[in-house]
Structure formats: structure tokens, C-alpha cells
Amino acid sequence: MQGIDVSKWQGTIDWKKVKASGVNFVIIRAGYGMNVDPRFYENYAGAKAAGLYVGAYWYSYALSRQAAEIEADCCKRTLAGKSFEMPIFYDIEEPNQLAKSAAFVSALITTFCTALEKAGYFAGLYMSRSPLQTKTTEDVRRRFAIWAAEYNTRLNYRGAVGMWQKSSSGKVYGINGNVDLDECFVDYPKIIKNGGFNGFSRGGNAAGGNSKNTPKQDAGTAPAATYYTVKKGDTLTAIAKRYKTTVSALVKANGIKDKNKIYEGQKIKIP
């Protein structure tokens, strides 16, 4: 599935032309630090009206867990009341972040993404291929959806990946100038709709801001939920062992009909 990612820097976009060009999805910058992207709401409305699958990303400047929590709160407020067929990604690429250890960077990612998961979002991580391999822990790479950037004819990343940003100089009908080009390898719209994430009620209907499954700005006293993203070769038995639970508990918590059938990219709730 072919897509693009955009921010205010693409200016005014003719989304009907973008859709007609063969683009299937778009990941829109919702904000950065504690700021909302000035064109986020405009881009969201236009992409939705054109029939594109829509996701979002939040560019991080966080240098502490507290700052990552604040960014997550800003992100949730910005996304509230909207539905997204694609994941919500945390964009980590600032040099002063990547100068830190893998444990430090992974703590930022886990803080932000867990906060989004508690609010009902399907969270993921955006990073360039090299720091993704050296500045994150295996637990982070296995737990969250991965969107890796590498401008090449192929992605030289050995781990499981859901999306690849393959160019920063693409040309797309309806957009003036360059735009990032992406390729998606996982059927996120199906997973997200069926799972009731990102503003959809379980089974695929948009919640419209009123369903109990709609992402909330404040998680209140609701218990924290942990999710695991299924990778190629995973089994429920292995996941159960990893999280010290049972296959039957996983089956019950996720409404799984056949314990022998799970698929790559699926979010498994850990009871």
C-alpha cells in the first residue's frame, strides 16, 4: 500500500488529486513538542473527504519522561474526536535525543506510546533505520508498530517493520514541491477497525466522539492496558510465556476465535 506523510511544509494540498494519483494513505503531522501543526485540521479534513486512510505523527523534542508525557497529552487533545485508520506515530529524530543511550530513548518512546495506548490509540514509532537499530531496545521494537526511514531502493532493516519511508523527494499530483513517500506492509486499517482503536468502535464503525471506545483526553482511573504487536513467527504460546500469562487468558481478553491463528501487525491485549 502506497502513501505519503505531510506537514505544514507542503502548504495547501489538493487531496482529491492526491487520491487520484494512486496514493492510498497519508500520515499527517499532528504536532511537535507542545504545538499543533498549523495545517493539521485542514489536512485531516481534506484527506478524509478524499477517501484516504489517515494516520498521524507527533514530532518529539522530549528530553525526559515528564516531557514525553506532556507531548502525549498534547497529542491526545489534538486527536480527540477524530478517527484514524493508520497508527499514531511518535517521531524521534532530534540529535540531542539520539545522543543519549538506547535505554533513555526507549523510555521516552514507551512513555509516549503507552499513554496513547491507555487512551485507545494504536501507537507506533518513527525513526531512521540506523538509530532504530542502535538506540532502541528489543522490547520497544517488538511492542510498537514500526515506521522506519531509509532513502534507498530497499529497506536494510532486519527486524519486523510495518511501514517504510523510502524517499523525501517524491512528486505527487496535488502537492507542490517534494513530499515524503511511504510504503505500508501491514493491513493497519483492518487491524485498527476490527480492534476498536483510534476512534473506531470494535468491528470498524467510527465512534464519532461518543462511544466508550472513543479515545479520551484523560484516562482517569482506568487500569493501564498493555498491548503487544504480533511479529512474524509469533505464537500465542510464546507471547503468553513472555508476559507470564496463559494462552486461554489471551484468547479471552482479545476475543480470539482460533488460538492457532494470529497475524503479523495484530495488537494483542495483555491481561
Residue ranges and their predicted role:
Residues 216-248, 266:
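Primarily a LysM-type cell-wall glycan-binding module
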Residues 1-10, 16, 20, 139-217:
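Functionally critical loop-and-helix segments that line ligand-binding/catalytic clefts
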Residues 1-122:
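Substrate-binding cleft of extracellular glycoside hydrolase catalytic domains
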Residues 67-70, 131-141:
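Glycine-rich, charge-decorated loop segments at or immediately adjacent to ligand/cofactor-binding or catalytic sites
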Residues 119-134:
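Aromatic-lined carbohydrate-recognition surfaces of secreted/lumenal glycan-active proteins
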